[in-house]
């Protein structure tokens, strides 16, 4: 072996290695555990001890609850004037017995801040209730508007359907009586027209629109119902052509769809 090589079995090399016997780390861990336990107990004792403010508060409350002794100069003076311990104030002794309690201010708020805070809290509560009420009102109104809109749409669809049915019945009944031209263009269903007829109809519509406003589907249905009942004694909701006006009035519930719902 060369002289410059390290001898790993020599005493010089082995002495440099730290003592790693199993017992040494164990003793160290035990000491640390004991130290932690002592610190924990010390913290518990500190937590159990009352703070200076708490002790001061308890002392103050105990002093306020205890009666003034006769050794007090002021109390001794009252006794000389005839006052007895436990006696109420006033000539008859029927006044206050207990002293007026002290309300010691402990927070950092200025005088009157409690009233300001209370008033602000009340205002916030009122605003919150007002918002909740407004929200409920809007939701209710929205639901009602939706129902009204749906009902209106349903009624409009029914009116359009009744109008088309009335137009077909009017054309058929007019033809049976030899009537070849409707009383008004919309009394009969619309038919396909050639270009010349469309131009002529546009001119007629323009002249009519100058004279009167355009009728709604409900207006047309009412006019057409009156015509069918008066001329043909016919009711589209009954689906029957009656013999005469008396027969119609006796056996038909009425001249609207609502009259026939029952």
UniProtKB/Swiss-Prot annotation:
Keywords: Centromere, Chromosome, Coiled coil, Kinetochore. Residues 41-62 form a coiled coil. It is found in: Chromosome, Centromere, Kinetochore. Its main location: nucleus. InterPro entries: DUF4187 (IPR025239), G_patch_dom (IPR000467), GPATCH11 (IPR039249). Residues 70-116 form the G-patch domain. GO terms for molecular function: nucleic acid binding. GO terms for cellular component: kinetochore. Residues 39-71, 88-169 are annotated as: Disordered. Signal peptide: none annotated. Residues 39-61, 114-127, 136-165 have a biased composition (Basic and acidic residues). Pfam families: DUF4187, G-patch. Belongs to the GPATCH11 family. This is G patch domain-containing protein 11. It comes from Danio rerio. The gene is gpatch11.
């Amino acid at each position: 072996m060369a002289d410059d090589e390290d001898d790993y079995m020599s005493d010089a090399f082995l002495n440099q290695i730290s003592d790693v016997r199993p017992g040494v780390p164990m003793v160290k861990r035990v000491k640390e555990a004991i130290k932690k336990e002592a610190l924990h107990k010390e913290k518990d004792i500190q937590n159990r001890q009352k703070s200076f403010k708490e002790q001061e508060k308890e002392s103050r409350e105990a002093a306020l609850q205890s009666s003034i002794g006769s050794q007090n100069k002021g109390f001794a003076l009252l006794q000389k004037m005839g006052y007895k311990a436990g006696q109420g104030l006033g000539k008859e002794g029927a006044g206050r017995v207990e002293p007026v309690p002290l309300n010691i201010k402990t927070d950092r708020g200025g005088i009157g801040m409690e009233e300001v805070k209370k008033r602000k809290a009340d205002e916030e509560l009122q605003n919150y209730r007002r918002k909740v009420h407004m929200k409920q009102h809007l939701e209710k109104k929205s639901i009602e508007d939706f129902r009204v809109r749906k009902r209106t749409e349903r009624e409009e669809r029914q009116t359009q359907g009744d109008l088309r049915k009335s137009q077909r019945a009017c054309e058929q009944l007019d033809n049976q009586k030899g009537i070849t031209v409707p009383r008004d263009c919309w009394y009969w269903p619309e038919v396909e027209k050639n270009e010349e007829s469309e131009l002529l109809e546009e001119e007629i519509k323009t002249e009519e629109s100058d004279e009167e406003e355009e009728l709604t589907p409900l207006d047309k249905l009412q006019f057409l119902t009156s015509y069918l009942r008066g001329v043909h004694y016919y009711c589209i909701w009954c689906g029957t052509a009656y013999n005469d006006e008396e027969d119609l009035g006796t056996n038909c519930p009425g001249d609207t769809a609502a009259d026939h719902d029952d």
